[in-house]
């Protein structure tokens, strides 16, 4: 059955890929996005004549009206990123929590399905692999880098509270998604930052010793898993979306350096030279994807090398525009 889908943050990295895939599958899609970080060239790439409504999720009346016009809400809109968290923690907490509350309040009236985009950050300083029901351990309140994780945890709790009131909601926790259209500015994730540097001949800056590990998931795989969360059998569930393939940040830099045939150097930089006071690095982050496999019958399709090549190619193309 085709569903009318509303995607908050749908002009962003994951949201834009999700919108296009839903349209391909025959679902009518509407995007809500306030272009918090500005418009990018890739917004011109969006296919399928998808309407984009440029409003904030804090606009309660507009969001209530839009939610009621749709069957499913993919709530991806958020202020995010470690550096943004460090510099704009108040704005982040107020926007993310209040926006999510607006969505849930609107959805409850008509029992609209909500897929809430959370993050692997909520696992804090625990020991991987992280399972959805694991306890959390965060740093001291003075460590501002945890404000995003704590806010997302509170939003998850709010989602589950609404689930107890009968709202069909599923929480998905993303683990390091990468691919074409990923942000490549000063607040970029490590992969787009490395690719941009490699293509421009700049140093690839590895923070710390580079031994910290992450599990990277190509965006089309993340989208496939997110769409699977529409199924009513995962209502009220929390599901990790990620890969089990661990890579050290040093390995990531080396692989990108090799695939781009770059003349750049790989340079190590202490964390304290990059982030303000209150930063705390997480050495390892790996998901337990048992629930993803069993409840969503999902397995990644895109290999690490293939995903990197496609991402690099996209960055080459926008460099030449």
Curated annotation (Swiss-Prot):
One Pfam family this sequence matches: Epimerase
Record: active site: 148 (proton acceptor)
Cofactors that this protein relies on: NAD(+)
UniProt GO molecular function: NAD+ binding; UDP-glucuronate decarboxylase activity
Cofactor binding annotation: Cannot use NADP(+) instead of NAD(+).
Disulphide-bonded residues: none
Any Gene Ontology CC annotation: cytoplasm
GO biological process, alphabetically ordered: D-xylose metabolic process
Temperature dependence: Optimum temperature is 37 degrees Celsius.
Function: Decarboxylase involved in the biosynthesis of the nucleotide-sugar UDP-N-acetylxylosamine (UDP-XylNAc). Catalyzes the NAD-dependent decarboxylation of UDP-N-acetylglucosaminuronic acid (UDP-GlcNAcA) to UDP-XylNAc. Cannot use other UDP-uronates, such as UDP-glucuronic acid (UDP-GlcA) and UDP-galacturonic acid (UDP-GalA).
Entry's family note: Belongs to the NAD(P)-dependent epimerase/dehydratase family.
Known partners and oligomeric status: Homodimer.
Protein name in UniProt: UDP-N-acetyl-alpha-D-glucosaminuronate decarboxylase
Protein species of origin: Bacillus cytotoxicus (strain DSM 22905 / CIP 110041 / 391-98 / NVH 391-98)
Gene transcribed to yield this protein: UXNAcS
């Amino acid at each position: 059955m085709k569903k009318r889908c509303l995607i908050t943050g749908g002009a962003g990295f994951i949201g834009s890929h999700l919108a296009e895939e839903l349209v391909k599958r025959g679902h009518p899609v509407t995007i809500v996005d306030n272009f918090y970080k500005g418009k990018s060239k890739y917004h011109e790439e969006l296919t399928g004549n998808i309407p984009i409504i440029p409003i904030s999720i804090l606009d309660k009346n507009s969001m209530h009206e839009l939610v009621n016009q749709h069957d499913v809400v993919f709530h991806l809109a958020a202020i995010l990123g470690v550096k943004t968290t460090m510099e704009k923690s108040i704005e982040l907490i107020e926007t993310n929590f209040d926006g999510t509350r607006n969505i849930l309040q609107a959805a409850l009236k008509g029992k609209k399905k909500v897929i809430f985009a959370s993050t692997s950050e909520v696992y804090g300083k625990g020991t991987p692999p992280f399972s959805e029901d694991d306890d959390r351990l965060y740093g001291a309140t003075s460590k501002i880098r945890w404000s995003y994780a704590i806010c997302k945890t509170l939003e998850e709790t709010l989602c589950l509270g609404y689930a107890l009131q009968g709202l069909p909601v599923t929480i998905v926790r993303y683990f390091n998604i990468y691919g074409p259209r990923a942000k490549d500015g000063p607040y970029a994730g490590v992969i787009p930052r490395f690719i941009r540097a490699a293509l421009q001949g700049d140093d690839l800056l590895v923070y710390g010793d580079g031994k910290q590990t992450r599990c990277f998931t190509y965006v089309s795989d993340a989208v496939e898993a997110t769409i699977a969360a529409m199924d009513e059998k995962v209502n009220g569930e929390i599901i990790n979306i990620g890969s089990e393939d661990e890579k050290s940040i040093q390995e990531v830099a080396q692989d990108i350096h090799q695939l781009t045939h770059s003349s750049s150097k790989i340079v190590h930089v202490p964390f304290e030279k990059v982030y303000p006071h209150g930063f705390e690095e997480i050495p390892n982050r790996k998901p337990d994807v048992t629930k993803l496999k069993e409840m969503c019958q999902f397995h990644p399709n895109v290999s690490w090398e293939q995903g990197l090549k496609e991402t690099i190619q996209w960055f080459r193309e926008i460099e030449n525009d």
